[in-house]
Swiss-Prot record:
UniProt keywords, alphabetically: Hydrolase, Metal-binding, Zinc
Name the UniProt record assigns to this protein: Hydroxyacylglutathione hydrolase
Name of the encoding gene: gloB
Pathway: Secondary metabolite metabolism; methylglyoxal degradation; (R)-lactate from methylglyoxal: step 2/2
Domain of life: Bacteria
Record InterPro entries: Clx_II_MBL (IPR035680), Glyoxalase_II_hydrolase (IPR050110), HAGH_C (IPR032282), Hydroxyacylglutathione_Hdrlase (IPR017782), Metallo-B-lactamas (IPR001279), RibonucZ/Hydroxyglut_hydro (IPR036866)
Similarity field: Belongs to the metallo-beta-lactamase superfamily. Glyoxalase II family.
GO process annotations (BP): methylglyoxal catabolic process to D-lactate via S-lactoyl-glutathione
Amino-acid positions noted as binding Zn(2+) 2 in the UniProt annotation, renumbered to this chain: D70, H71, D150, H188
Quaternary structure (record): Monomer.
Keyword Metal-binding in annotation: yes
Organism for this UniProt entry: Prochlorococcus marinus (strain MIT 9313)
Length: 260
């Protein structure tokens, strides 16, 4: 199962972003341009190695959004095969991602595949969680893109393992301020379950009901629900729609207790 968002795959010098589903619900995103690839949050290595070698691609860099094992578990093995690949991660997480080679902080910019990638601090799920934003480049990506790890999900957000509701509220508000057409590349396929929860809370909400029907149909066909867009999350994501950190905390508590 593979989903692709691309500007122009017929032109090998333009970027394309591909999904590699692994484990139960992880999605490893692979951004390619020419014969180079950037891999985001590789939970495990073997499927990534196979995917890259089949396409005769070289690993240029790994982007790490946070330190959890299902996001960094495959990185060291990938580095054994591509020892010159960079590993970009939060400087604040140097103790938990010690193999990082490019340590970044909020608003830093990193040049990858001849594009400028902006780092966004989005604490909440973990204290040092970051996202990576690729602005629009009409000669490359048609739409902006954000790799947001476990901060923003399709119709949901990450659990608050280290941060507070205030942290998450600020992180989601920040992501929500990105251009509406920004493509959202999160790290887990949770969209359908999140929408079922949202629909149970707001059965009268037409936008949520319509998105749930669309996502359920896609999943039944074996397709992914992702990437989504910032505008779609603004319409149908209750956490993004929250008006305060207090409201977000109440929603997060309710979702944590909810069983489909």
């Amino acid at each position: 199962m593979e989903a692709t968002s691309t500007a122009a795959t017929s032109d090998k010098q333009r970027s394309s972003i591909h999904a590699l589903p692994v484990l139960q619900d992880n999605i490893i995103w692979i951004w390619i341009k020419g014969n180079q690839a950037v891999v985001v949050d590789p939970a495990i290595a073997e499927p990534v190695k196979t995917w890259l070698r089949t396409r005769k691609l070289s690993l240029a860099a790994v982007l790490q959004t946070h330190h959890h094992a299902d996001h960094i578990g495959g990185t060291l093995e990938l580095l054994r095969d591509w020892p010159n690949a960079a590993v970009v991660a939060a400087a604040e997480d140097r103790d938990r991602i010690p193999f990082q080679t490019i340590s970044v902080r909020d608003r830093d910019k990193v040049s990858l595949l001849n594009s400028s990638v902006e780092v966004l601090a989005v604490a909440g799920h973990t204290r040092a969680h970051i996202a990576y934003y690729l602005p629009t480049n009409k000669e490359d990506l048609e739409d902006p893109a954000v790799f947001c790890g476990d901060t923003l999900f399709g119709a949901g957000c990450g659990r608050l393992f280290e941060g507070t509701a205030e942290d998450m509220f600020k992180a989601l508000q920040r992501l929500s301020c990105l251009p509406a057409k920004t493509r959202v590349y999160c790290a887990h396929e949770y969209t359908e379950a999140n929408l079922r929860w949202a629909s149970a809370l707001h059965p009268e909400d037409v936008a949520i009901s319509e998105r749930l029907a669309d996502v359920s149909s896609r999943r039944q066909r074996g397709a992914l629900s992702l990437p989504s867009s910032i505008s779609e999350e603004q319409r149908t994501n209750l956490f993004v729609r929250a008006q305060s950190s207090k409201e977000l905390a109440e929603l997060r508590h309710h979702k944590d207790q909810w069983r489909n």
